[in-house]
UniProtKB/Swiss-Prot annotation:
The gene is hisA. This is 1-(5-phosphoribosyl)-5-[(5-phosphoribosylamino)methylideneamino] imidazole-4-carboxamide isomerase. Keywords: Amino-acid biosynthesis, Cytoplasm, Histidine biosynthesis, Isomerase. It holds the Pfam family His_biosynth. Gene3D superfamilies: Aldolase class I. Its main location: cytoplasm. GO terms for biological process: L-histidine biosynthetic process; L-tryptophan biosynthetic process. It comes from Rhizorhabdus wittichii (strain DSM 6014 / CCUG 31198 / JCM 15750 / NBRC 105917 / EY 4224 / RW1).
Length: 243
């Protein structure tokens, strides 16, 4: 059994940053050359990248487009992109520019037909972002919390043909508290869609804890701060993830 490790590049003002609990005022800058960071992840063996336009998530439109395009050109593997993609034009634009999969978060809650239509016409290319605070779906760059439960959101797209669900425990994101394996696996077992774990990965132990659940529907795991802070070695994480 194996899972995918997605090293994360979060963009704010063209820089590589990590936030604590999705708070834009608690951003740590890790570099000002996103394309170079993408190359370094590729050299360590990464086949996928998880890229988020943080400014875009709050603005509802692409803000760090130049940096994203530079990453796509620099990274030889596959890129999944989220942040501010809320209409079909945005989806089509990024796929045409070389993004492999597009993550729809806020729009999945507000405009589910967009997700259904795109997933039907673009099989394997649409990921639904399930960002959770205390079991409820958070939207608009995690600044707002809805009354929709995470399993309710998953159920809405059970037969839509989306590639996967990206489950982020917002309360752990960027805090190195450890991945919420229990909640992630519970969602994967409930849903008929593969699940990517995100939020709180602190060490190789978090990767190892998820690998046995590949059979439950865990497709992969996203890691950011642990890599940037040197707590997690990407090459080792990739090796462990291969089972």
């Amino acid at each position: 059994m194996s899972i995918i490790v997605f090293p994360a590049i979060d963009l704010k003002g063209g820089q590589v940053v990590r936030l604590a609990e999705g708070d834009m005022d608690r951003a740590t800058v890790y570099g000002d050359d996103p394309a170079d960071q993408a190359r370094r992840f590729a050299e360590a063996g990464a086949e996928w990248l998880h890229v988020v336009d943080l400014d875009g998530a709050f603005a509802g439109r692409a803000v760090n487009a130049e940096a994203v395009e530079a990453i796509i050109k620099a990274f030889p593997g596959k890129v999944e992109l989220g942040g501010g993609i809320r209409d079909r034009a945005g989806i089509d634009r990024w796929l045409a520019l070389g993004v492999e999969r597009v993550i729809i978060g806020t729009a999945a809650l507000q405009n589910p037909d967009l997700v259904r239509e795109a997933a039907k016409e673009l099989p394997g290319r649409i990921v639904v972002g399930v960002d959770a605070r205390d079991g409820f779906v958070a939207t608009h760059g995690w600044a707002e919390v809805s009354t929709v439960g995470i399993t309710d959101l998953a159920d809405r797209f059970a037969d839509a043909g989306v590639a996967s669900l990206l489950f982020t425990d917002v309360g752990r994101d960027g805090l190195l508290k450890g991945c919420n394996v229990e909640a992630t696996v519970a969602l994967a077992r409930h849903a008929s869609i593969p699940v990517i774990a995100s939020g709180g990965v602190a060490s190789i132990a978090d990767i190892a804890a998820l690998v046995p659940h590949a059979g439950d529907g865990i497709e992969g795991v996203i890691t950011g701060r642990a890599l940037y802070d040197g707590r997690l070695d990407l090459a080792e994480a990739l090796r462990v993830a291969r089972g």
